[in-house]
């Protein structure tokens, strides 16, 4: 027998914590006005019948739902949430567009990461690194009768075959979990209904996990340029490419095409690449990429693109025009992919950039609609989307309201050389803690002693001077992402510099440097240095 409950949709999940803390019997507890998102959380494998408030504010009417959870978007966060929800007994459906390798507007099961993001990009990174390794091998006695050549067409075909395989795996995972996969474009009709290609589906909860799409600035000739989606699936390898942007996507593709022997020019509006990263890392990676032949054009903003009679392209900036490009690529950020979903028509609030506004539990302004991943523009990383999806399922189907934990989230830039980081930058640590100790190492790795190449490694620890806790860990050099992933556990556990010092290193390795740096490169004492000083003097002394 179904139970009808009337609750206020405006209440937050914090009500649950308050209710649990009160000395009430179960009947009294159930009479409290709990949020709709927490009703019937333990109900398994059945259609929910509750009282849903009508949009015009009239008396609630009984509602019958096809699913407990309906998800729009089959990317990393959505798949995690759907699969876990199904495992907990919920009836789940998901809608996604057909497979496509090029456009974020036509995606496929697996989303950005699997089809036009992390996975294909990393495969391109692997392909491009061989040229550097061929150069390194000469110093180790390797000789080649002829210079190795790269077959772009066969590589792209192999890459696409792998993406198809991964998409198939994702579909099998959903199928085995009992999730209904619906192919098509989903659009919100009301807080509990989604239209997929003309057919309506109702659900107690709706999750939006549609990710993001590349952003191209509105300048004359922008239609002549490509974005990061297209760059992963070009019919021919660039001969000379202009990459507009100074973020991680720009640097990763700069390294890729440089390794594949294209002439690479990077145009950035700022003085430095990677805004938001540690300042020393920013300087070091640009220097190392320049040594490898990549040309950086700083403080240059794109103004127009033109095409010549010979088919080449010219890029005009505020400082002049550079001609002769076979490709011009924009890596100028991404935007949440919230267009044509009907979100605002049902009351979901969006930020200026189109991101879905959510609370700390991933709930939108509409009580029955939730959102995770890049579409919320919180921390746009695949593992973070997975975490958000897992936390949401605990909130909805395990009677365990759970917030995603964003402290000490590691990240990487698969540039060449790559970057790994976790925790605070030096600049952030100074602002938050004031007194900090900085440990750095800048050295030539063992491999470079025989290769003869000018490769170097930079490593950095940011330590709180008062508590000795390691606040930040940064590295730029070979295998940096792999090394930093392990140390992320240490920062998550709030280990101290003394813990690092007490750890035996692996020799010879670059990683051991993190546990053998004993003497601070510099000590920043914001409280002491600011005493008796003001203005720019105090800021400079504090390292700001």
Swiss-Prot record:
The active site is a redox-active disulfide bond. It catalyses: 2 glutathione + NADP(+) = glutathione disulfide + NADPH + H(+). GO terms for cellular component: chloroplast; cytoplasm. This is Glutathione reductase, chloroplastic. Homodimer. It comes from the Eukaryota. It is found in: Plastid, Chloroplast. Its EC number is 1.8.1.7. Its cofactor is FAD. It comes from Glycine max. Glutathione binds at residues 76, 170.
